[in-house]
């Protein structure tokens, strides 16, 4: 896939209405609706400011949350109260989704920009159409949650066309959503010239560069609970990496595949053959595939569980592995110290419990001290690095969880493929 895409800096924007897809899917307090982290809004500011400073009229849009489960829960409650589900119409759909409105995002964006952010109470309805039509250069309008329109997640051409009709140019800056072929991330590019914003440009340059032309040795650290979620990543990185480090719950499937005893540890037995195939492929290609040599075990899955450290493959019945052990930490950190490029995706243990966070903390610290190019995938790894205060020591922390994972798999990303090539 070609990652050399045109950016907002490559096209004329002055006097144009620009549809800007951002990733404003921010975490909120469940009770008050208050935004608990504005990191994703801040990440979009460079592109927004560039467009406004260069005389564009910006029509920003994003999704927020998952409306369908919220609606289903609401319908269930109404049904329990004696309402007929058939009577819960489109108006009811919108009423049930009030908590997923983009209004708080508009308020926070206005504070960060230091200027007014107009807000449309729909996506392609009368309010959005009127406000978009009246929008002047240097002004910004935020549309309501794109997922309030059922055609969004279906990539419905009719909805995509209506959304595109509000503007003259499409700019995609929502890396966290480019792995989804939705109307606002891919479909609109069928009706408008489409380029990337600065956030996506950086993601493509840094992550694409690490895969296409890495400073070697290239070390990939893969954690998380399941082998099944990392199949494509391991397979793709075996073609590129010099060393692959396995941690987290998925290490126990590899261990069991080699005949080790893993007690009550997480096991995906259906993936044991695959694990052995990957070990053989690594050997055939001369890639070092490092597995834990010791593990921190617990008598139950709880933050206050009794713990012990045992050799890998020798976990007694009734116990489960929840973190990599100290000798493994030493080996993994040594590999990081010698690396030219490090890509990290997934924690080494149950990071949420202090007793089983040492492995993840040690890897994060090792990345903070190395001279290598360090790239942290989104999700739990990024959260760990930020929580530990090492974020500013990393070369790049990806803004996309699922998107960065699919990038590492070598998959085509619909929200990138639809952009104009340079």
Regions found by a protein language model. Name each.
Residues 1-422:
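Active-site loop-to-helix "anion-binding N-cap" substructures in soluble metabolic enzymes
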């Amino acid at each position: 896939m070609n990652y050399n895409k045109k950016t907002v800096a490559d096209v004329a924007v002055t006097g144009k209405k620009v549809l800007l897809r951002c990733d404003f899917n921010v975490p909120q307090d469940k009770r008050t609706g208050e935004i608990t982290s504005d990191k994703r809004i801040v990440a979009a500011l460079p592109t927004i400011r560039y467009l406004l400073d260069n005389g564009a009229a910006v029509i920003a849009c994003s999704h927020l949350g998952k409306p369908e489960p919220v609606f289903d829960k609401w319908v269930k409650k109404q049904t329990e109260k004696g309402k007929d589900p058939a009577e819960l119409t489109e108006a009811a759909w919108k009423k049930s989704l009030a908590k997923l409105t983009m209004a708080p995002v508009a308020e926070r964006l206005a504070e960060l920009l230091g200027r007014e952010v107009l807000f449309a109470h729909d996506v392609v309805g009368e309010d959005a159409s009127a406000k978009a039509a009246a929008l002047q250069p240097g002004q910004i309008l935020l549309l309501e949650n794109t997922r309030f329109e059922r055609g969004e997640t279906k990539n419905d051409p009719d909805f995509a066309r209506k959304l595109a009709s509000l503007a003259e140019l499409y700019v995609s800056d929502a890396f966290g959503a480019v792995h989804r072929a939705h109307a606002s991330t891919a479909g609109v590019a069928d009706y408008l010239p489409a380029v990337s914003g600065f956030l996506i440009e950086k993601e493509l340059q840094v992550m694409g560069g690490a895969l296409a032309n890495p400073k070697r040795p290239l070390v990939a650290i893969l954690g998380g609970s399941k082998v099944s979620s990392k199949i494509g990543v391991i397979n793709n990185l075996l073609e590129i990496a010099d060393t692959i480090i396995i941690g987290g719950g998925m290490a126990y499937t590899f261990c069991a595949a080699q005949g080790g005893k893993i007690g009550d540890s997480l096991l995906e037995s259906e993936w044991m053959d695959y694990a052995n195939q990957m070990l053989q492929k690594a050997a055939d290609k001369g890639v070092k595939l490092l597995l834990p040599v010791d593990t921190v075990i617990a008598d139950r899955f709880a933050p206050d569980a009794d713990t012990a450290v045992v050799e890998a493959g020798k976990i007694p019945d009734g116990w489960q592995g929840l973190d990599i052990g100290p000798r493994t930490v030493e080996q993994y950190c040594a590999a990081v110290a010698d690396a030219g490029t490090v890509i990290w995706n997934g924690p080494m243990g149950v990071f949420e419990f202090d007793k089983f966070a040492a492995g993840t903390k040690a890897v994060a610290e090792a990345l903070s001290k190395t001279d290598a190019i360090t790239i942290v995938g989104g999700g739990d790894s990024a959260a760990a690095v930020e929580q530990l205060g090492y974020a500013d020591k990393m070369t790049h922390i990806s803004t996309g969880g699922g998107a960065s994972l699919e990038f590492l798999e070598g998959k085509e990303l619909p929200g990138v493929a639809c952009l104009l090539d340079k």
